[in-house]
Amino acid sequence: MGQKTHPLGFRIGITRDHKSSWFSNIKSYPKLAQEDYKIRSCIEKQLHNASISLIYIDRKVAQVQVHIHTARPGIILGKLGRGLEDLRKKLETTLKNDTQIRINLIEITDPDKEATLIAEFIVQRLEKRIAFRRVIRQAMQRAQKAKNQGIKIQVSGRLNGSEIARIESVREGRVPLQTLRAHIDYSYKTTHTIYGILGVKYGYLKEKK
């Protein structure tokens, strides 16, 4: 039976960094790791339509800095800029401790270069019951604007309501998953439709600088 390795976890320390930055002793580590999970879950649930590609957590002595990379910062800020303060209070309530939280928004200027946002685009279109081939073609057109060396899109499930689930994939260029030095961005999303669950995988090889 084939063993699958996550393309991003496989490259941590080589071409990818961790999504959290902090140190802890053995006793405190589980608690802090769970807090990171709660922070990310709360943000993703409350701001599911804000086009967030990365939530980076940086811990200091009694302070947690949350850096949110988003293509739509206006949705997070809300009217009169109160959205950020409301989110901060929500996170502090979720953690249920005295930890001070600071939130920093980082705007994404080119969403077509973010694998997470392209995968979300595919999911949103599939939820609207648009034909999957048309959705893949639209996603490929967006991805090609980023001028990357390779693109791969895979959609699986009961596509277009077919009786038998199948996998459809499109590849352009090269996406070397076994080359650790390759700068690959990857995202996996699922969506619920009236026919069942569909899985979406999107990955691309970044252009060399």
Curated annotation (Swiss-Prot):
Report whether Chloroplast shows up as a keyword of the record. Answer: yes
Keyword Plastid part of the UniProt annotation: yes
Ranges of residues in domain KH type-2: 39-109
Q: Which GO terms describe its cellular component?
A: chloroplast; cytosolic small ribosomal subunit
Could you tell me where this protein is found in the cell?
Plastid, Chloroplast
Q: Which UniProt keywords apply?
A: Chloroplast, Plastid, Ribonucleoprotein, Ribosomal protein, RNA-binding, rRNA-binding
Database matches in Gene3D superfamilies: 3.30.300.20, Ribosomal protein S3, C-terminal domain
Q: Where is it mostly found?
A: plastid
GO MF annotation: an example: structural constituent of ribosome
Hey, which family's this protein in? Belongs to the universal ribosomal protein uS3 family.
- The protein's name in its UniProt record: Small ribosomal subunit protein uS3c
Q: Which gene encodes it?
A: rps3
